[in-house]
Regions:
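C-terminal regions of RecA-like/P-loop NTPase motor modules
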Residues: 2-23, 36-39, 47-59, 71-161
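Walker B catalytic acidic pair
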Residues: 27
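Catalytic P-loop NTPase motifs of RecA-like helicase/translocase cores
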Residues: 31-32
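Donor nucleotide-sugar recognition loop
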Residues: 42
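Conserved H-loop
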Residues: 61, 66-68
Length: 161
């Protein structure tokens, strides 16, 4: 894999040439880092997140950073397993530094195929939980997905065949 320094060098070159519109890193925990003596994984991840935020500011280019979650949401007593901010794996720094935090959630993946409150069929329905948005609103956005094609489309409550 590569380091934040490797990414920084490439992004700054592209940025100076006016060719940097978005940086996507999939995913945070695969970034290589030299771990200092007595440094925790949380601290290493935090250092990388902070460096990527600084890069975003310097290059004037957004960074979309994909991160793994811990397993806490899977052990909650409610069967929905809806993610919350503290589910971000190995770093409270993500919560502090990120401008926006969005969780992708698919009820069907947890065996939930019908909304108990509304009766809506949830097969092929996903939700984006916008749990932090420094420059806008938070909330839930629905989408449709087709796992056969890994295709995401706009949400419409009426499904046509």
């Amino acid at each position: 894999c590569c380091t934040v320094g490797d990414i920084r060098a490439k992004v700054m070159l592209k940025s100076k040439a006016g060719e940097c519109d978005l940086v996507v890193i999939d995913y945070l925990h695969l970034l290589s880092s030299v771990r200092q003596k007595n440094e925790t994984l949380d601290q290493v991840v935090g250092r990388n997140v902070t460096a990527l935020k600084q890069l975003s500011l310097e290059a004037d280019c957004p960074v979309l950073l994909v991160s793994q979650m811990n397993r806490a949401c899977e052990t909650r007593p409610d069967k929905a397993h809806v993610p919350v901010m503290s589910d971000l794996r190995d770093s409270g720094t993500i919560e502090q530094v990120a401008d926006c935090v969005v969780f992708v959630y698919r009820p069907e993946k947890h065996g939930i195929t019908k909304d108990e409150r509304t009766g809506e069929n949830l097969v092929g329905v996903g939700k984006l939980y916008i749990v932090k948005n420094r420059n806008g609103a938070t909330g839930i956005a629905r989408f449709r997905y087709n796992p056969s094609y890994t295709k995401i489309t706009n949400y419409c409550n009426t499904v046509t065949s």
